[in-house]
Design a protein with these regions (language model features):
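Non-catalytic accessory regions outside enzyme or core folds
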Residues: 2-66
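C-terminal functional extensions of proteins
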Residues: 12, 303-357
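Glycine-rich beta-alpha loop segments
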Residues: 30-34, 46, 51-232
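Solvent-exposed alpha-helices and their adjacent loops that cap or buttress functional pockets
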Residues: 89-92, 197-200, 223, 243-246, ...
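Short, solvent-exposed amphipathic alpha-helical segments in soluble enzyme
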Residues: 114-117, 223-224, 286-291, 317-320, ...
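Phosphate/pyrophosphate-binding betaalpha-module
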Residues: 205-208, 212-274
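Short, acidic/small-residue loops that bind anionic groups at enzyme active sites
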Residues: 226-239, 274, 288-311, 327
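Active-site/ligand-binding-proximal alpha/beta "capping" segment
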Residues: 255-302, 352-353
């Protein structure tokens, strides 16, 4: 039996049978249209207004709805790559010193105010709530006032909420002791800034995440001595405003963590990590990993406050366990004073210059 072959017309019909294809036969409208609409002056004017106000007619770069689309993510990331870069070039910023640290570590007056509020909250709830284990010690160590009058101020807080207040009091006591790190970050930024911004060329410019706590302290230190500093803020639900000590033209807001991290690392000459939480740990491990894998320039990575960091993570245990090499322990160092941290940075780069690396 002879094999049937399709005619070219049949192939065309098969390949173009999709809706709206050019090969679809035209449909005949059973209702005759009004052929005089183009002569309706009012209608034409209305259509012209619609053309001029249509999103499709606006310049693509000015179409916010377009830029916010998921498909435009790459364009948005490119903008976040380019905008800070142009600002850094305009201000002749050739290198930066990153300062990371916790948002909850604030200056002493703020920490004392927070502790006072925590004491007051515990005192108001103590009369009607059973004391959880350890609460008595926390209250008495945090407050010199007598607790005999607590009953007269008692609220109707539940045992759970009272326990939470006790926990907040304990945290406030601890955070008060960390005020020294705020002072140290501020002094460190003063030392670095005043040594490196004496002319139009700006080296070792302080750069932070732009928020409160240790970040504020570092920007504030540069501000103290009339020097510039950078703040890379991130747009998050209910998140921070920038601290008031950042140089205005060097304060940026990012949508993407990836682009923010890129600008942290790009010009980094040193990374100094003060005590902090998950965000600080994230930056620490990312920087260590980039150095471990030789994916960023050699920089000193300094952990400020050995006592804190040795409790947070046991690096020696990682080496002893074989999951990192002994050589990886040399990727970072510790510092206890601002002067020591700054000297380590100077020594690191002088040694690299001496070796020609």
């Amino acid at each position: 039996m002879a094999k049937k072959t399709k005619t070219p017309a049949a192939n065309l019909q098969e390949n173009t049978s999709g809706a709206g294809s050019a090969a679809s036969p035209p449909k005949t409208c059973s209702i005759l249209p009004d052929t005089t609409l183009g002569d309706d002056v009012a209608l034409v004017a209305e259509n012209m207004e619609a053309i001029l106000t249509s999103p499709s007619y606006s310049l693509a770069q000015e179409d916010r709805a377009l830029l916010d689309r998921t498909e435009m993510r790459g364009v948005r990331m490119l903008l976040e790559l380019g905008k800070p870069e142009l600002a850094f070039q305009a201000d002749s910023i050739t290198s930066t010193v990153i300062v990371f640290g916790g948002t909850q570590i604030v200056e002493r007056t703020a920490a004392e105010r927070r502790l006072s509020e925590a004491r007051r909250a515990v005192a108001l709830s103590a009369g009607s709530s059973p004391q959880p284990a350890g609460a008595t010690a926390a209250v008495s160590s945090a407050s010199p006032a007598s607790h005999a009058s607590h009953a007269s101020h008692a609220s109707h807080a539940s045992p759970v909420s009272h326990e939470k207040l006790i926990r907040e009091l304990q945290r406030s006591v601890q955070l008060l002791s960390y005020c020294r790190y705020y002072d140290a970050a501020r002094e460190f930024a003063r030392l670095v800034s005043i040594d490196n911004q004496c002319d139009d060329q700006r080296d070792y410019v302080i750069i932070t995440g732009g928020g409160p706590g240790i970040m504020e302290a570092a920007n504030r230190g540069a501000f103290d001595v009339g020097c510039k500093s950078v703040g890379l803020n991130i747009k998050l639900p209910g998140e921070q405003q920038p601290n008031p000590f950042i140089t205005p033209e060097l304060c940026f807001q990012f949508k993407y963590f990836a682009m923010r991290k890129f600008h942290f690392i790009l010009r980094a000459a040193a990374v100094v990590l003060f005590p902090g939480g998950f965000g600080t740990l994230d930056e620490m491990f990312e920087t260590l990993t980039l150095r471990q894998t030789h994916r960023m320039q050699p920089v000193p990575i300094i952990l400020f406050g050995r006592d804190y960091w040795s409790k947070v993570i046991d690096f020696q245990f990682l080496a002893d366990s074989g999951v990192i090499s002994d050589d990886h322990l040399s990727l970072f160092s510790y510092a206890e004073t601002p002067a020591d941290a700054w000297k380590q940075i100077i020594d690191f780069h002088e040694e690299r210059k001496r070796r020609g690396s």
